[in-house]
Amino acid sequence: MAPRCLLIGTPSIAAHPERLDQVYEIHHRSSTDLQMLDRIAAGLVNLPAATYDVVLLLADADGTTRESHKLFSRDVMNKVASALKIGGVLKSQAGPFQGAEKTEAILAGLTETEDGMAKPEQEEPVSIPLKFGKNKANGVSATNGTNGAVNPDGSVPLNLNRKRDQPEPVKPAGVGFVDFSDDLDDPIITGEDDDLIDEDDLITEADMARPVVQPLECQPKPGKRRRACKDCTCGMKEKLEAEDAAKRSSADKALNSLKLDADDLAEVDFTVQGKVGSCGNCALGDAFRCDGCPYIGLPAFKPGEEVRLLNNDIQL
């Protein structure tokens, strides 16, 4: 079975397919994968774990490593190291790794070999028993307590009268007393002058500019709305809140467009102007009708026009 190989190219080499054809003459296409370094750095590509025997970092279109040096960060190196099999090798087309790239490879767990940066085998931890023998260090046997003395008959004498080490008495737990009689003139150390490190200073501009990779748990499932985690740190919570605020503001604008202000309302008077109210002028409107007039609430009508009230329905 041919060894699996991963080719990592820079954006500049994508415009020169002849460079890739030269590489494919050495590495067979059926067992070789090609990924772009900028897509790996942006988190758009996930490399499979423990898959490749060889990872080859291609040089730039001009034969240098300037572009790859800018994109080959610690995060990218960790992804490449995890994609290597045990014993796999990371190589560079431009030559051995130097400087920061070599340091990042070592920090990712790779070791320097003649072929490149190899992924070593992880040995299982071995427990080593430790024997503490104070008598053996002094040349005294732990069995008989003597310096190797033997009786004429071959027996080993036992020194039963030897003084044994007495353990120190355990001090009772209680309130301790501190003697300040000899350091009254010394200044009291309060710890206010200790240098404190601001955690914001540890974040560089490159870390802030790095795109946020959305975890697989935060990606929406088919048929379900996206929901942010309780302790969301990928920005999904802020994004959803901004979307909800935008939808709420657009709905408020649509609702306000349907509301009528006081200036938009007009009062319509159906009464006939210039008439004096008295009984018999019911056709002129409510202003000329009595309190008990049966036409209260009806619009004005022509004098002499017949008005019928049938089942509370007005018929003129």
Curated annotation (Swiss-Prot):
Which Pfam families does the record associate with it?
CIAPIN1, DRE2_N
* GO CC annotation: cytosolic [4Fe-4S] assembly targeting complex; mitochondrial intermembrane space
Any one GO molecular function term: 4 iron, 4 sulfur cluster binding
Question: At which positions is [2Fe-2S] cluster bound?
Answer: 218, 229, 232, 234
The entry's function note states:
Component of the cytosolic iron-sulfur (Fe-S) protein assembly (CIA) machinery required for the maturation of extramitochondrial Fe-S proteins. Part of an electron transfer chain functioning in an early step of cytosolic Fe-S biogenesis, facilitating the de novo assembly of a [4Fe-4S] cluster on the scaffold complex CFD1-NBP35. Electrons are transferred to DRE2 from NADPH via the FAD- and FMN-containing protein TAH18.
**How is the quaternary structure described?**
Monomer. Interacts with TAH18. Interacts with MIA40.
Name of protein: Fe-S cluster assembly protein dre2
Please report the organism this UniProt entry assigns to the protein: Pyrenophora tritici-repentis (strain Pt-1C-BFP) (Wheat tan spot fungus)
Designated gene of the protein = dre2
